Amino acid sequence: MKNIYGALCCGLALLAYGCATAPESEAPAPAEAPETPAVQEVQEVQAAPESKASVTTKFFAKNKLGQIVMQYTLKGAGGVVMDVINYGGKVVRLYLPDKNGESKDCTLGFNDVAGYETVDPYFGSIIGRYGNRIANGLFVIDGVTYRLPTNNEPGGIPCCLHGGAAGWDTKIWNAEPFQNGDNVGVVFTTTSPDGDQGFPGKVEAKVTYTLTPENVWRIEYEAVPDKKTPINLTQHIYFNFNGEAEGTILDHELTLCADKMTPVDAGLIPTGEITPVAGTPFDFTTPHKIGERVDTKGDKQLEYGNGYDHNFVLTNPSKNGELAQAAALYDAKSGRYMEVWTTEPGIQFYCGNFLTDKMVGKQGKPYQFRGGLALETQHYPDSPNQPSFPTTIVQPGQVYKTTTEYRFGTK
């Protein structure tokens, strides 16, 4: 599986300190999702004639409430295979071929629901209703103060992280697998009630995963509230191109199409500034190994995050709904390569600074500090409290809609 994007997108565009934009791909139009199937037998969506792609459904586990969790295996015609579940829309496994055609699982996660219900750092999850942090769990809309549960205290400063302790990553979503030619995927839907985790308004949400024959994993987010409410959806998949639980990601080379960032305070809350990355360890406008500068002494931003855990502002963000390149990731040893394209204005780069050996992965091996990284497309953290940031307040009846693609290949 050779890289089909590199020369066009990263080879030329990034060397010129910029990123290209591309038209948003057309996604299949899935049917409305039914209730979660209460079955345990394997089911297979009818494959298209002569297609190498397929979707298989099977029982995964029951959660602590006794609810059934189903697994959907998306086998792409281009060689990528994904196992996803309807508990939080989590990606449990992601098999990526290397430069020799050998596939490995390259994402962090657990073999059972119990792992996700106890020590899970959002592995592979849909994040909502608000991805990233909201300072002190407070925000104001039209003079009304809304109080959210605080579930994170970096630097001893409380915040609401990723939608609260019972965010959308903990929901059993309705799920409908589909196949449209060589495109395979799952449509996840859920209803978040008014007052869910303290947020105002009922929200009808739909997240569509599509795996294409070009080895593109497309995520389309849609949400419609009935009251003004902040919405900021993302995916929290962790990557390690060495393979799951196989060392750290410090030798991975990262490029970010971002010449600015939003610096944070000791609580990892943005200060409201947007500052250039030039001349700092945060300058990834050209490729750098993640371990090259992550422990730079005297850099307050790295000290606050115990490494990289920051929002980067895209240099050339999406216009008119077109996808813009946000990042590229490369592992020279395996040859695995990925690009991230999005309609969002920012991307959170997190290099696994809070992973510990208390988290035991799918191979029975403990995860290492910095044993995985996340590239989360998003609006900026704490936007409801930062008037200078692009707004995340969605109006009643307004359709919130964003798209992100993870494009996999080798070189």
Protein language model annotation of sequence segments:
Residues 1-8:
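Bacterial N-terminal signal peptides that target proteins for export
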Residues 23-80, 86-411:
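An exposed, glycine/acidic-rich loop-and-rim segment of catalytic or binding clefts
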Residues 15-18:
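C-terminal motif of bacterial Sec signal peptides marking the signal peptidase cleavage site
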